[in-house]
Amino acid sequence: TTSSVQYENDDVMRPVWGDDYSICCCVSATQTGKEMQFFGARANLAKCLLYAINGGKDEKYKTKDGKPMQAGPEYAPITSEYLDYDEVMHKYDLMMDWLAGIYVNILNLIQYMHDKYYYEAAEMALIDTDVRRTFATGIAGFSHVVDSLSAIKYAKVKVVRDENGMATSFVTEGDFPRYGNDDDRADDIAVWLLKTFLKKVKKYHTYRNSEPTTSILTITSNVVYGKATGALPDGRAAFTPFAPGATPSYGAEQNGLLASLNSVAKLPYEYALDGISNTETIAPGALGHSEDERKNNLVHVLDGYFDQGAHHLNVNVFGLDKLKDAMEHPEKPEYANFTIRVSGYAVKFIDLTREQQLDVIARTCHEAM
């Protein structure tokens, strides 16, 4: 089964990490015995976009008197009926500056306290004394930010506000290019977002002079981050799961598997050395009629994807009906060891929470190449 393994590109990792590297965490490479990583969760760039629109006020959390909480810097909110791309980008850039600063500062505190109270002396004794340290950061809500900015740029996005003047939802008028369709108009925004946030993170001092890196990898926390984030201009409903990692948003991919892979392959690995996790679900029939034909076609798909410089791919080959049946009838013997790739790791489907199972079912299942 393809879901029991993940595929990573040695051609992009070997020049960075050398011949003797290992995969740690989920998809991240590391020089074996020579380095360690300060792990750092993710920054919710989708929520950051809403902060830019709402002047740093939180769309979910309230003060004791029921007013929106001023969680970010008190910048002037956007008050126009329709979102202007240049205005949004200016405010978003400022809000990302603030987020990168507070993100790195908090991670510095966490790593300092971890070393103070739970230093991993036994593990460090097995590593070279001249240790290379990387400072891991990450991005959550990636595809939704890309599609939201694309909607603002190429369509008309009307803001729906509540009695407090908070943007609570958006009405998009017209079509716009979405990440995951091999359309450079959207994919260029994706590349910009990745490069920009890492550059902002690198402006700040990191604990023990570690090297800042980033990832587009959320594991199953895409569900948790989504729970805290309101509606977005790309059409994602409030407090629903994000697409995981660098995977395009659910339903955004309209041109088949290859177009989706081509979009993700444009993300430069050197700007996300902790990993660019991509999880794709493919209906068996999309790969061919016979088992041999499917294997052969999948090999060609992987070769084409990785030849473009892509970093990582999880492949699930099954139909959605099987997932739905497994969710409703977990007692069936055939599902006891039914394993899927969620994001950076493999798990038995019946061991996921129902909320996580529904998230997996909601993902795009490619019916065509």
Indicate where each model-derived feature is located.
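Conserved catalytic cores of very large enzyme subunits
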Residues: 1-369
